[in-house]
């Protein structure tokens, strides 16, 4: 009999739905808080965690000692002529990690909370603190401080953009903003529109003694503050340290003001990949339930000896819940950035991975694909014999594991040691969330580094829907339901998904589910049923063992000319695994039969291919590959390889690309082609290369 990781609870309401299911450990009732806790608010939760782990390290961070700028001249085609263009790269020089214990963090939380009240924020649902900053220890400390005084937090990605930021500030009537010094210039227009803002708290003190980048960092922040005060002379500005100092000085004057379970904890603004960002309302009871549900799936596998590296945006619910989970485990958080993870991207110091030596790491598909391709590039540069030994060991290990032959897990540990050392050498688990990853990428990284678990959730469900339990490890599934949710699948007739086939739109209910979108009745009524089911817009499928598998999103299913649907995210996860692809956006014109791939190329392997085809000279640098992205011979070769990738991974017919176009440049939150959660902004990407896409369709 097949083991069942979820169980039905009651019968299907009608023939158009599956029976609702829960994690088998929560058959009787779903969790509303983490096991072995008594908390009902985020403040009570962290107090329990901090008191239990007192003297252990809670979090670590690195200071930026200097930012080094390096320039290189590269040849680039401009108006058809080869021209020398200067490109600049920024490299960070960082300190070693500094640490706070859980005891110290308790004091800091209360001091920040008192400091916020001292400057003028009132402990209630009306005065809100806007967190508009990159992930850091100070972001989390501001969040915790606000919780200690019952002050709701509003989160906005540091790359949300001016329009989105203004929308979130005005809609919530936020009274204070915490931000990075580098983001101060971007507040000049928003604070003119958002007249409720009275206080700005910036990450670092602004001092002329700061000589980093020859004083540019200081000067930029100093000038921005002056500009802000010109347009809003009533706004008061403070540094993080100012708030901390005010809190220390008022410890006998201001009491803690704990929130209630039904009070507002935070409003999290979605990244707005389409349309205006929506504010997801999360009460304290929602967040506590979300953390509790997720904790059930990995409770036996993590603990207070683990070291968790964190670099995803804290404005993303996935990262926030994961860091709160780390407190529950008693693990130590190490703050990092995508730019400084590896030693190749820093100067005069080690990268974050080698410096911190994490045991657990969370990322999104784009991060893992970059890791995988970086490893493949290293392998490709090995001597022939070493390369052969590597692939022999890898394929033998893979086959032994697939056939369940004992010893497969340990095979190749010596061969793969160098790769593991580059990630700190101590990783035990990786977790992917936020977007689908190809089965091949999951299997590859699992076998070279450590098991990659898959998580699935949404801001509206407080990130908590599924996490693959390490004891039930399986490739290609979203995994076990968390302990707080009840899930059913509902017919999507127009797309051909029916509950009778164990497929349909994923509907979720539980104490973790948002009660509403902030001041948005229309969106709320569309997403939530009157009896509390949240309609995710994702298409799911129940596996025979009760695992949930996510097939795609309703909005990313496109009907082609012949009446059949293709799943864009599914195709992207497959084609993204190709060695020549750094990122891909699949576009399907509804008047055509097949889609087109818009590709950000992976420079190193593409350069090798161009040299092999005689398109580039052997002495040419990979930087120069940008000059050959419209070469017909190169495009044809990559297109052929992509078709092979698709066929090898089971794609057929209309799922195979009609053609490809190369995109000259990266897709980053800064240039507006992806969100901070690395979700594609499809319309913007298409508009940038529309002529090329039209040309592909015309010739196919």
UniProtKB/Swiss-Prot annotation:
It is an enzyme of class 6 (ligase). GO terms for molecular function: ATP binding; long-chain fatty acid-CoA ligase activity; medium-chain fatty acid-CoA ligase activity. Its EC number is 6.2.1.3. Coiled coil: none annotated. Its cofactor is Mg(2+). Belongs to the ATP-dependent AMP-binding enzyme family. Activates long-chain fatty acids (LCFA) by esterification of the fatty acids into metabolically active CoA-thioesters for subsequent degradation or incorporation into phospholipids. Also facilitates the transport of LCFAs into the cell, either by active transport or by decreasing the intracellular LCFA concentration. It may supplement intracellular myristoyl-CoA pools from exogenous myristate. Preferentially acts on C12:0-C16:0 fatty acids with myristic and pentadecanic acid (C15:0) having the highest activities. Also involved in long-chain base (LCB) uptake of sphingolipids. Present with 7470 molecules/cell in log phase SD medium. This is Long-chain-fatty-acid--CoA ligase 1.
